[in-house]
Amino acid sequence: MRVQFWGARGSIAKPRPSTARYGGNTSCIEARSARGTLVVVDCGTGGHSLGQNLVSAGAEGVRGHILISHTHWDHIQGIPFFAPLFVPGNEWDIYGPKGLGQSLREALAGQMQYTYFPVPLDQCGAKIRYHDLVEGTFDIDDIKVSTRYLNHPALTLGYRLEADGVAVVYACDHEPHSRMLATCHADITGQDLRHAEFVNRADLLIHDAQYTAEEYPAKVGWGHRGRDGRHQ
């Protein structure tokens, strides 16, 4: 399985020379199996560049899947600018957590109302299917997808993709359930143990590490974790 990062930032895009090393766009990951199954995980502002790349490749009848972790803007802002959604003949399945107070489709359509964007979601040319998810496991062609709830202020899912003998785990916005675990050495129990089991033995782990150890104490409860390497 091949993975490419199109966006790794949080909150707001910051395209500038000082952010060039890791890029300035918000969350968007592309994963492809050896068979060619295309899965996009989150569609922040990095989704614009990915979409342009797919269109420039010239392929017709693109079939793809988008897994949305949650509907905070930095994870869905690329949807209105994701060019393959506007191409007739393309087919896309979009997945996201169930229980947002509205359907996934309604949440995504909200940011494309005329008040905010000139083209509504239902005028996209591609055929789009929407799937509201809970914790569980399902298959996208040859890719096995497992979901697990993360600890974040919005209802958020982490994704584990398994194909071609490897596993990729995407746990974008997550804070340890135990404050003791987040700030010092502690035994992993309860929901934190479930999370550890979910990410265990991943060949590639893409995980929240928003704050330095010095920053984190002032950000407890914000739904992100600090990074100090002790629990890697």
Q: How should each PLM-predicted stretch be described?
A:
Residues 1-182:
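Binuclear metal-dependent hydrolase catalytic cores
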Residues 175-232:
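Cap/insert and terminal regions of metallo-dependent hydrolase folds
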